């Protein structure tokens, strides 16, 4: 369910300050964040944000198609290793 329009998009203040500082200085170094719940804003376009997935920080380069989505959508938390092989079929 989407967030109410009267509330507006959510972004953590500490992340917003980091983004504004990086845009102001023109720094291209990745911004490390644990805030997966923050919405991607238009002023983040062109920045690389390292989003934590529970184990490591995944670098996410923000493009214009990502605006309005959450940062956590681009840093998967689960790794799929496939289903277990059938032991009977393997034996023959």
Swiss-Prot record:
This is Small ribosomal subunit protein uS19. The keyword Lipid metabolism does not apply. PANTHER family: RIBOSOMAL PROTEIN S19P FAMILY MEMBER, SMALL RIBOSOMAL SUBUNIT PROTEIN US19M. It comes from Salmonella typhimurium (strain LT2 / SGSC1412 / ATCC 700720). Keywords: Ribonucleoprotein, Ribosomal protein, RNA-binding, rRNA-binding. Protein S19 forms a complex with S13 that binds strongly to the 16S ribosomal RNA. GO terms for biological process: ribosomal small subunit assembly; translation. One of its GO terms (molecular function) is structural constituent of ribosome.
């Amino acid at each position: 369910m989407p967030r109410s329009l009267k509330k507006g998009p959510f972004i953590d203040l500490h992340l917003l300050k980091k983004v504004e500082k990086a845009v102001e200085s023109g720094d291209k170094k990745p911004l490390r964040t644990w805030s997966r719940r923050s919405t991607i804003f238009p002023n983040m376009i062109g920045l690389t944000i390292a989003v934590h997935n529970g184990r490591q920080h995944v670098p996410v380069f923000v493009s214009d198609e990502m605006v309005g989505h959450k940062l956590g959508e681009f840093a998967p938390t689960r790794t799929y290793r496939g289903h277990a092989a059938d032991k009977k079929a393997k034996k023959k």
